[in-house]
Amino acid sequence: MAEEKYIMAIDQGTTSSRAIIFDKKGNKIGSSQKEFTQYFPNAGWVEHNANEIWNSVQSVIAGSLIESGVKPTDIAGIGITNQRETTVVWDKATGLPIYNAIVWQSRQTTPIADQLKEDGYSEMIHEKTGLIIDAYFSATKVRWILDHVEGAQERAENGELMFGTIDTWLVWKLTGDTHVTDYSNASRTMLFNIHDLDWDQEILDLLNIPRVMLPKVVSNSEVYGLTKNYHFYGSEVPIAGMAGDQQAALFGQMAFEPGMVKNTYGTGSFIVMNTGEEPQLSKNNLLTTIGYGINGKVYYALEGSIFVAGSAIQWLRDGLKMLQTAAESEAVAKASTGHNEVYVVPAFTGLGAPYWDSQARGAVFGLTRGTTREDFVKATLQAVAYQVRDIIDTMKEDTGIDIPVLKVDGGAANNDFLMQFQADILNTAVQRAHNLETTALGAAFLAGLAVGFWKDLEEIKAFQEEGQQFEPIMAEEEREDLYEGWQQAVAATQQFKRKNK
C-alpha cells in the first residue's frame, strides 16, 4: 500500500511563523508556531531580523513534522504564504541580510513616499501598479536600505545584492539558489506593472533601484524549486505554491468568483474582493492588486487595508494590561453596560484605507467619569468593525457590486461579540469560515494543485464547510448614529498631528 502523502503550508506572519500539515481532504493534522522579536528602533518604525524569521521557519517545519508524525518523505509539496511588503536585502554571496527586514507597518520611509507625491508621480504609479504611494509598500523600503547602508547602492548595481519580500527570502533559503516571487507578492512592491505583469522600468529608474537585484516573477501555483536536503531532513520536496497572506486567504476561502469578498482579522485587517480577469482601479483609495495567477490566467482583486485590528487587542493586553489574554476581550466587552459612547481610533501607525493618513495617531473620544475598563475594551473591538465598514462602503461605491455576505477568517473572527457587531454595523450577514486556517489552506491548495495532489478547483470546492453565520439585528437608526460618531472621531483624530521632533 502506498504511503499517504500530505501538503505542508508555511505561514510566515508578522509576529510568528507557523507550519501546518494538511491531508488530502484539507484537514489540519499537525502544526507548530514560533514567535519572533519585533524591533522598534524609533517611533513608527517596525523591523524584523530576517535570520530570526528563517530560524523560526526551520523550527516550525521540524515541530509540525514531529507533532503530526508525518515523515519528510511523505510531504508531496510545500506552499508558502507570508506577511507582504516586508522587505529584505541580502548579500548574494554570503546569504546574510545587509539590514533588518523593514516591516509593512513601518513608517520610516514616509519622507521618500511624500517626496514622490510632491513630485507629482501619484497618478502614474496608481495607473501602473494599482497602488497609492505609501511607505507601506516595498519600493520605498528598498530605496531606504540602499540609502542607509554604506556602499549598498554600488553593490546592488554590481549584482552583489538581492531584494525580496519574505516569500522570496524563504524560497531562496530553502532551495539555496532560487530567486523568485509570485504575482501576488510582486503586486505589493509598488515596482510591478500589473498590466504588463513585469517589473516597471520607469518606476525602477525613478527610485534608482537596479533591476538586477529583483527576483523573477512567477505564477502562484507551479514548482519553483526543491528544498535542499539538509534543510528538509534528507528530502528534496517541491516548493510549489506561493501567495501573500491576504491573497492566500482569498484562495483558501474559495472566493474564486468575481464579486466574492473576504476579510481576514489578523494583526491588521484586510478586505479583499475578487474582481476577475480585469484590473479595476479604485477612485476611492482602495488598492488594485493581483489576487492570484494560476493555469495561465491572472485574477485581480480590490483591497482595503486596515493597519491595526488584532494588534489593538494585543495593546489592551500588553500595553494597558486591561486583559490577561486576547480571547478574554469578548467576555469583557459583553460585560460593558455603557451605551457605545466611547470611540477608540487605533491609528497607532497612521490610518490605512480609505484615509491613507500616515501622520494620524491613535485617540480615544467620549470618555466620562463613568467609563469602565469594559467600555474601553468594547470600544476597541468596535473600532475594528467600524474600520471594516469604511472599506466595505468604499468597495460598493467603486464597483457597484452589492455585498450580500462577508466571509471572515483570522484569529479575531473567533470573537462572537466582534462578529455580531460587524454584521450589525454593516447591515450585512457575516459568515465565519469553518476552518479559520484559510491563509495556510490557500497556500496548501496552490501547492497541491501544482504537484497533482489535488486535480482541480472542483475537487477543492468539495471540502468547503460553512461556519457560523451572524445576521444583523441592530435598528437602522442606531447603526447610522453609531457610525456617524465613528466618522466624527476619525475626523478629529486627523486634526491632531504632531511632527516627530
UniProtKB/Swiss-Prot annotation:
GO terms for molecular function: ATP binding; glycerol kinase activity. ATP binds at T14, T15, S16, T267, G310, Q314, G411. GO terms for biological process: glycerol catabolic process; glycerol metabolic process; glycerol-3-phosphate metabolic process. Glycerol binds at R84, E85, Y136, D245, Q246. Sn-glycerol 3-phosphate binds at T14, R84, E85, Y136, D245. Its EC number is 2.7.1.30. Transmembrane segments: none annotated. Pathway: Polyol metabolism; glycerol degradation via glycerol kinase pathway; sn-glycerol 3-phosphate from glycerol: step 1/1. The modification Phosphohistidine is found at H231. Homotetramer and homodimer (in equilibrium). PANTHER family: GLYCEROL KINASE, SUGAR KINASE. This is Glycerol kinase. It comes from Enterococcus faecalis (strain ATCC 700802 / V583).
